[in-house]
Amino acid sequence: MAQHRVVLLPGDGIGPEITAVARQLLEVVSRRHGFSLSFEEQPIGGSAIDATGEPLPASTLDACKAADAVLLAAIGSPCFDSLPREKRPETGLLGLRAGMELFANLRPVKIVPALIDASSLKREVIEGVDLMVVRELTGGIYFGQPKGRIETEGDERGFNTMTYSASEVDRIAKVAFEIAQERRGRLCSVDKANVLDVSQLWRDRVDAMAPSYGPVEVSHMYVDNAAMQLVRDPRQFDVLLTGNLFGDILSDEAAMLTGSIGMLPSASLGSEGPGLFEPVHGSAPDIAGQDKANPMAMVLSAAMMLRIGLKQAAAADDLEAAVDAVLAGGFRTGDLMAEGCTQLGCRAMGEQLLKAL
């Protein structure tokens, strides 16, 4: 029997509530499909600050690096906003990504038929949308040097450097090409090569790698056009590959095609070692502990963990099918509530998901 070690990071706010739901479901599907999951909970973010004084204890990072996969719920609380930036909960996530050497962020966007009317776009535009944004996570303008602010004669100047090496582009492009091979075989690389030298390098490297992935159809699109096309005709996209800054913007734009951030999972991967899987949404401290949280994105993040991190695709299929079945049955948490549906709390939604498995 295959055995997998999973570190759970409940974190802050609604994190513990949605983690409990995901864990129950994972225990059921692992038994059904003949593999074993051992769970270890570790503190991160605000909960870690309360327990240890640090947003990312060394013991948490060590446990994550030794695991087969890491499932994170949510980080952040306004009660820590007065702390120095380097001591706030969010720096725990940044440190975790750096410590685990994660460079590829995956954001799937798939329209759930039962929720199609939740989108602000017309049904005929978004029906059938199923795309993946692959964003480079550790390079580009957010991390490039030099950066800073300087005083000049009678003025002040701020500056950042957008930079990528060929090897950085190659490793993120490899991830995107491999995902495209497993999906519908189309990869659109998004850049600004008409004005940026760094984007010209990006495009050249993607083109150089394309022959190694022969069946994959490769196209290029400027980022301004990509932003427009995502709302004009999102069905044209299969896999979108882009850098850190452009991906930060486009992934959030693509997320809202679904109409609810409460349904969106994500993954962050490195060249080797465990991946980090987490919902896109935040910690929602305003509803924490009130049994109002939507656990769906956490459950779908657990499905991504099974499929990508642990290579248990059949179990992932079961979790995703359970989510679809519960929504098709008219069950909703408050954030998704619509006329004619039945509103449930977090725990009751977890019970419906268990019944649907």
Curated annotation (Swiss-Prot):
Mg(2+) binds at residues 224, 248, 252. GO terms for molecular function: 3-isopropylmalate dehydrogenase activity; magnesium ion binding; NAD binding. The lineage of its organism: Bacteria, Bacillati, Cyanobacteriota, Cyanophyceae, Synechococcales. Pfam families: Iso_dh (PF00180). Keywords: Amino-acid biosynthesis, Branched-chain amino acid biosynthesis, Cytoplasm, Leucine biosynthesis, Magnesium, Manganese, Metal-binding, NAD, Oxidoreductase. One of its GO terms (cellular component) is cytosol. Pathway: Amino-acid biosynthesis; L-leucine biosynthesis; L-leucine from 3-methyl-2-oxobutanoate: step 3/4. Catalyzes the oxidation of 3-carboxy-2-hydroxy-4-methylpentanoate (3-isopropylmalate) to 3-carboxy-4-methyl-2-oxopentanoate. The product decarboxylates to 4-methyl-2 oxopentanoate. Its main location: cytoplasm. It comes from the Bacteria. Homodimer. The record marks 142, 192 as: Important for catalysis. Its cofactor is Mg(2+); Mn(2+). This is 3-isopropylmalate dehydrogenase. InterPro entries: IsoCit/isopropylmalate_DH_CS (IPR019818), IsoPropMal-DH-like_dom (IPR024084), Isopropylmalate_DH (IPR004429). The gene is leuB. Its EC number is 1.1.1.85. NAD(+) binds at residues 282-294.
